[in-house]
Amino acid sequence: MTHATHRQERDQWSILAWVVVAASLFALMVAAPSRSLASSDELTTEDKKLLAKGELVMKPKNEQRGAYKLFGGQSWQIIDVPASEAWQALKNLSGYKNFIPLATESDVSNQVGKEADVAMRQQWGPIDVKYVLQTTLEAERGAVVFRVDHSKDHDIRAGWGFFRVRPYKNDRTLVSFGALVDIGDGVFVSIVRPAVRKDLLRIPYFFKKHLEAERVGAQVAVD
């Protein structure tokens, strides 16, 4: 699968749904991400069977936290690449534009040790969403946690989240994603909320497709 084909697949998302989900994924509140979100204890025996079949497992969640009406949850996907390869892709913050739908920029700045800022931009027609993420790499856990820099412009009320990759059977990787977001109120929000929830939790699937496309591209280059 070429990069162009992969981007065409991602561009087929509902425009309205992605306008919000794009901002939702990366616009994060100042509070630190909950460690409980990153746990694999939520996976049941049936979930593990579904994962083994190559399916995406999603667990939606709602939570009221102060004035914030949060929704999101967790999702998991097995990827047919070694964990070391998945981690290289995950910690390459400037490469996020390659697997976040409609992303056109992911520029890294102020990188000091494990911390970095990432200026994200998503575009679709006249829609142009920008924000700066404060990210932390946790190599010992194979995780990236992120939150919005609220001193910069942002298009969502609140949220936070993480990516994580771990070794799985037969030299594969279990990728997990979790986020809780408050996208605000209004008639438009109430209409798109179900689609946003679903697409937000599909992020591990799109990460998987990106890595598979990278592998195919590398093999073609060698041949």
Give names to the regions the model predicted:
Residues 86-87, 96, 135, 175-177:
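Hydrophobic pocket/interface hotspot
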Residues 18-31:
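Bacterial N-terminal signal peptides
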Residues 1-14:
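N-terminal secretory signal peptides that target proteins for export/translocation
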Residues 72-77, 83-85, 150-151, 189-196:
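Second-shell loop/turn segments in exported
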Residues 58-60, 115-118, 142-149:
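Short Pro/Gly-enriched beta-strand edge/turn motifs at strand-loop
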Residues 39-41, 47-50, 124-171, 180:
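Hydrophobic-ligand binding "helix-grip"
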Residues 174-176, 180-223:
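A conserved amphipathic terminal alpha-helix motif
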